[in-house]
Amino acid sequence: MTFNHKKMEPKWQQYWSEHNTFKTTEDKNKENFYALDMFPYPSGAGLHVGHPEGYTATDILSRMKRMQGKNVLHPIGWDAFGLPAEQYAIDTGNDPEEFTALNIANFTRQIKSLGFSYDWDREINTTDPEYYKWTQWIFEKLYENGLAYEAEIAVNWCPALGTVLANEEVIDGKSERGGFPVFRKPMRQWMLKITAYADRLLDDLDLVDWPENIKDMQRNWIGRSEGAEVTFKIKDSDETFNVFTTRPDTLFGATYTVFAPEHELIEKITTPEQKEAVEAYKKQVELKSELERTDLAKDKTGVFTGAYAINPINGEEVPIWIADYVLIQYGTGAIMAVPAHDERDFEFAQQFGLNIRPVLEGGDVTKEAFTGDGPHINSDFLNGLAKAEAITAAIDWLEKEGIGSRKITYRLRDWLFSRQRYWGEPIPVIHWEDGETTLVPEDELPLLLPKATEIKPSGTGESPLANLHDWVNVTDENGRKGRRETNTMPQWAGSSWYFLRYIDPKNSEAIADKEKLAEWLPVDVYIGGAEHAVLHLLYARFWHKFLYDIGVVPTKEPFQKLFNQGMILGENNEKMSKSRGNVVNPDEVVEKYGADTLRLYEMFMGPLEASIAWNENGLEGARKFLDRIWRLLVTEEGTLAEKVTTDANANLEKAYHHMVKTVTNHYENLRFNTGISQLMIFINEAYKQDTIPKQYVEGFVQLLSPIAPHLAEELWEILGHTETISYVAWPTYDETKLVEDEVEIVLQVNGKVKSKITVAKSLGKEELEKIAQEDNKMKENLEGKTIRKVIVVPGKLVNIVAN
């Protein structure tokens, strides 16, 4: 006997919708709980089975917290700007807005079919002008506070496509789409000064409950380094250049220097005989993306400029090379190379026959770089010193000589904020003919994205908005002509603050009401994929800290607890993808097995953070368990089974209280697979009984409801209730019912186990000895033997020594 999910699930989804069951309560007498999902990009492909894993986890918490008497904010929305919709529009001539709306409608249908308890009144969409009005407002505040500025930045320019490409869209110097050549070209771009927040972004990681690996990824991305900036003179020239190093103590081992190919001094210092080679090399580098240039696995390339620098600590002449692995935007765009103690410098020195001088004892630098620590050698006044003392001594010397100073640098660069795209938030800026740049007045926001009948690249490197002359060209009241900014914001913009808008999504006067922000922030739990570990989470923290500084939000950090669910892989353990043809569509699973089965299966697959392969058998197993519950509690006629009675049943008492305690604990700690195991254990116990107390059945159904809400609502109704289960007080347990009053005692003869008995915990030594000697198996083993000694350990064992 089985239940009909095709009738049951739509029935309860309709009930929740008509009764607005999951509308966020804002009762001042209750505690608040904010459970947030990383909102999806509504792609044309729709949901895949990976999406519901994180969504089910937050839904379980949300449903449990409502039953525990909390106000719960559990919202959903759409991160709907972005490249795929624009590409689709360029390829098909369709409107990206219409395409996005269709995709959102499909995602909404799919999400509702899975029974998630979202408050749909709070739905947001980053492409809605009433939403992006506030994205633009935040940009204006950043600009007013000196944190948004324009700069000439080298971008990936593809003449054939007439557009600028992101690093990810360039493969081996060619466009991912079409395989056209891509060049590095300087263009004016908007930048956000995230570096101003580097220290706070680093230090405040200590305030949040996040996975340590994610914190480490952010720390590495920010990359705070303490060291020294050292000035090198160029031989036979008045020019100097600076390098930053974390190891100024190894200066005696610096045997050459390397410039980024874009370094401004190259032009001036290259000798006539090296000019041709240097120019050819620079052209070659133009075709490479940053990722390719810094790939550790690739062969080192470079070229000698013909010029020499003077090592400031020992006066030696050292050659100046250029190489692609040095990037102009990191540090000073020049490095001092210590090949004896740095793997990359060692490989480069070997490739080009450059001098390798060890300055730390240990290792064999004829074979490989020694990157460990040891006392200093070949280092004059630093000889014999350990690392920390030597660094201090070297910096003191540099500062005394006036050729260096202590310095802190960051790997973090300012955020390149403009995109040469149509489908994004317009940047609310006007460039006037007299050179002034102004913001669109705040009372004129939102600056609407204009409709375009045809979206095509401008051909100049500007966005397709540059083609819309009526929109771009403006005149002020004094007849001064200007042009609107044609770049749009990156997709990261709308997702950097969306969690604030959910708190007060209809507010037309502010991002959200201050009191409401104070009540709901920070987000209690944020669940999503680890692929957003750095960029999204770092950008959102940056914007949040800025909004904190200008008094908009009341907390320093946006997300108190972060959890990354694992990836659901294809049956063959490969990542699910269209090209592999192994994507599982949740629609098909819901049709065949039901949404509750899908939810149960995804939570039972393994630990939430693990990446696990999809398995159809596991899905069938999940459905069988739900059918087993149904058969235990419901008759063929759909009424409550006769074995469910109001009578007590001492045999189930301990199992019930143990289940309530452990399931609650496991849900709280996101250990859903072990929580489900406890539900299964209880059902196994219940099957062995002639009667099951109705109170225990009700408690069980409540514990099941966050995982399988449709089935739980149906069972709740069969149990005689007329209201939804969603707000019924969460079951409680009695600790005294869990105390063990019996223990298992091992009975041994000469140290070998012969029998086991269960006795009252309170029995003393004499009683245990007596029971042991009367045990039938012990009698058999003692026959014909003389008892020499009896060892009794109460609560554990009785060992009889006999011969």
UniProtKB/Swiss-Prot annotation:
Q: What is its main location?
A: cytoplasm
Keyword ATP-binding among record annotations: yes
Q: Where does ATP bind?
A: 578
What sort of enzyme, by top EC class, is this?
A: ligase
Signal sequence span per UniProt? Answer: none
Q: Which GO terms describe its molecular function?
A: aminoacyl-tRNA deacylase activity; ATP binding; leucine-tRNA ligase activity
Q: Name one GO cellular component term.
A: cytosol
Q: Quick one: a GO biological-process term for this protein?
A: leucyl-tRNA aminoacylation
What reactions does this protein catalyze?
tRNA(Leu) + L-leucine + ATP = L-leucyl-tRNA(Leu) + AMP + diphosphate
Keywords attached to this entry: Aminoacyl-tRNA synthetase, ATP-binding, Cytoplasm, Ligase, Nucleotide-binding, Protein biosynthesis
Where in or outside the cell?
Cytoplasm
Cross-referenced InterPro entries: aa-tRNA-synth_I_CS (IPR001412), aa-tRNA-synth_Ia (IPR002300), Leu-tRNA-ligase (IPR002302), Leu_tRNA-synth_edit (IPR025709), M/V/L/I-tRNA-synth_anticd-bd (IPR013155), Methionyl/Leucyl_tRNA_Synth (IPR015413), Rossmann-like_a/b/a_fold (IPR014729), tRNAsynth_Ia_anticodon-bd (IPR009080)
| Coiled coil, from the record | none
Renumbered to this chain, motif 'HIGH' region spans: 40-51
Give the EC number(s) listed in the UniProt record.
Answer: 6.1.1.4
User: Which ranges belong to the motif 'KMSKS' region?
Assistant: 575-579
The record ties this protein, via CDD domains, to:
Anticodon_Ia_Leu_BEm, LeuRS_core
Task: Please give the Pfam families that the UniProt record associates with this protein.
Answer: Anticodon_1 (PF08264), tRNA-synt_1 (PF00133), tRNA-synt_1_2 (PF13603), tRNA-synt_1g (PF09334)
Extract the PANTHER family matched here: LEUCINE--TRNA LIGASE, MITOCHONDRIAL, LEUCYL-TRNA SYNTHETASE
Q: Which family does it belong to?
A: Belongs to the class-I aminoacyl-tRNA synthetase family.
Q: What is this protein called?
A: Leucine--tRNA ligase
Instruction: Please tell me the species this chain comes from.
Output: Listeria monocytogenes serotype 4a (strain HCC23)
State the gene name recorded for this protein.
leuS
